[in-house]
Amino acid sequence: VNSTIRVAGVSAIEVTSLLSASGASVKGGLSLLSVPLKLNFQYVMDQLKSSSVSNEPKVSLDEDFELALTEGFSSTSNFTFDTSEMSLNATTPSGPLALSFTTGPSSLTTALSQSGFFIQSDNEQSKFNVNLPSNGWNFELDFQEFSTSLNMPLLAKSGEQEFGMSVNLSGLNLSDTLWNLFDSGNLMPDDPASMKFAIEGSTILDEGLTSEAIIENQNLDPLEFGQILRFELKEFLLNALGIRVEANGSFEFDNADFETFEGIPRPTGTASLRIKGSNAFIDRLENMQVLPSETIMGARMMLALIMRATGEDILLSEFEIDEKGKVYANGQRLR
């Protein structure tokens, strides 16, 4: 399938798309007459595959989104490709600009039903590059893996419903040009960085998340339309700049008590925190002179207050919130 869109006026736009059995591509250009700007872009996906399954009741999503879900609407779709490449070249008043983004095997899965909404994205072997020849800048970063997932309830129900979210980024590398912007003296280890976290929990929704009152009010407090029953930090990992931080925890909430912790239901549970390499990291920050000495000293004092040393530059802390709202760190009461 081949299609072309052209628009002319104060600006000229042309977009051409091609969809075939082996992949897909989109390319086009933009030229503004009022500003000396020209832009060309292209996005190509190889070995593109997609599939979808849906069940549609008599009431459509367009007619009544919430009622359609209640009546049994469901849809699942999957989208994969082996490689992709996006490139953008622009001529601006300040000089030329080039952007590129490439990925290896990638996939996107979505599902929608009365159970809620689910989305998962996975990308491997990705690389992002920005080139500004007029300034002599050529920035590049790449990562081995980047995946995210989210599942959330949508409809109001009397019983509890599950939610969850996860992010996994591994093998992140920065080019020397980009690294030198904040560490020109190479004081920090530049090993590949990684970050991972996963949360899950349960809630009771007194009002569906698809209601107009919620969608139109972006500043609405989530506790105004539901209750949080349980929250679990299943995993947290940050490994970068020579420091490794790991954490996990689990809490339950008493929605009849908003006074012990003003404005939120009273939590009860435990959490643990482990930090490796913090002293060496703070020493390097001090040598870089990016923070005032008072801030550095404050960070050391805070760590000494809530953490205990368990090995060579390893700190550990166990946190607890009891049923009376008392907060402890390693058995020492903080609140």
What are these regions (language model features)?
Residues 1-335:
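Glycine-rich, small/hydroxylated-residue low-complexity segments
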